[in-house]
Amino acid sequence: MTEQLIDIAALRREYTRGGLRRADLTAEPMDLFEQWLKQACAAQLPDATAMSVGTVDENGQPYQRLVLLKHFDRQGMVFYTNLGSRKAAHLAHNPRISLHFPWHVLERQVLVLGRAERLSVIEVMKYFHSRPRDSQIGAWVSRQSSRISSRGVLESKFLELKQKFAQGDVPLPSFWGGYRVSIEAMEFWQGGEHRMHDRFLYRRENGGWHIDRLAP
């Protein structure tokens, strides 16, 4: 490795956008999440719905990747993926999952812990056919996480399938689906001055939510 040109140990900034107090919290974590997501969208953060999805393989090796949140309500958070993907294989073995939303500009982050469950075909089909047509075709192209010789393989396959599906609706691939993450815990983090950040953890307890303030 060449000599490090950037002193990353010295890179830091103060967090000054405000704190998070217990009086700001909602009884349901999804209500606070909705407020924060709306503010992230209003601030025109790029990919405000992007979340890091953490899964674990059968050897205990954790993996992360960015995926877009496509729906949320009090039943959980929903995302879609190729069912032949690495993440799908992990979830088949171990449904425990983490989601992380990094909203750097707002000096906020949200951590979600829960369990993933496959969506019904009806739910998946409804969303699939709401996507742009080229995105529907793109879902057919990729056998996610498989090895390919070049990008040209994907581009050629896309053109082939675009011609094949030129007439009528693009069918739902059998290897494409979605997951709903039922939430067991959710942490809200707001940056604070002098590294005294505000953290609140919601945990399911006795049919409701128990809230703890955590030290930064």
UniProtKB/Swiss-Prot annotation:
Its cofactor is FMN. It catalyses: pyridoxamine 5'-phosphate + O2 + H2O = pyridoxal 5'-phosphate + H2O2 + NH4(+); pyridoxine 5'-phosphate + O2 = pyridoxal 5'-phosphate + H2O2. FMN binds at residues 65-70, 80-81, 86-87, 109, 144-145, 189, 199. One of its GO terms (biological process) is pyridoxine biosynthetic process. Transmembrane segments: none annotated. Binds 1 FMN per subunit. It comes from the Bacteria. Catalyzes the oxidation of either pyridoxine 5'-phosphate (PNP) or pyridoxamine 5'-phosphate (PMP) into pyridoxal 5'-phosphate (PLP). Homodimer. This is Pyridoxine/pyridoxamine 5'-phosphate oxidase. It comes from Sodalis glossinidius (strain morsitans). The gene is pdxH.
